[in-house]
C-alpha cells in the first residue's frame, strides 16, 4: 500500500511540475510587436521620399530579442528584403538587405515600444522608434537620420496588423 501512495504522490508531483512549466508558455500573451504588418502607404509620410509601393514586415519578439524580416517594393519597382535578429542589450547586430545601414541595436522602452539605432560602417545614421497602438491593430514607426545618399530623412510609417 505504501508503494501505491508513493506512486500517486510522484505522479501528482510530475503533473504539477508539467503544469507549472507549460502554463506560462501556453497562456502568456504574445508580444504586441510580433506578427505580420502591412504598410499603409496612404497614411505614411516619407521625407524626402519617395515612399515604397508596398511593404510587409514580420516581427518575432521575445522578452530578450527581436527578429525582423521586411520585404518592400521600392518606388522604382525593385523588391528589397531586409533582415536582422537583435537582442535587447544595446549591442550592434548585422543587418542584410538594405543599403542604408549594416547594423542595428535594439532597446525595449516599454511593452509597446522598441527603439533601434542603425549604423553604417560603425557610424550612427538612423534612429527608429516602433510603437504598437494600445489596441494592437496598428504600429507607427518614425525614422530620422540620413539615407544612403546622405539626404536627411524623417519618415512616419503606419502599419496595420494582418
Predicted regions and their residues:
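Hydrophobic small-molecule pocket/channel-lining residues, especially in calycin-type beta-barrels
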Residues: 26-162
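Sequence-pattern detector for short linear motifs
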Residues: 8-11, 142
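Intrinsic-disorder/low-complexity peptide segments enriched for small residues
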Residues: 5, 13-16, 37
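N-terminal secretory signal peptides that target proteins for export/translocation
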Residues: 1-8
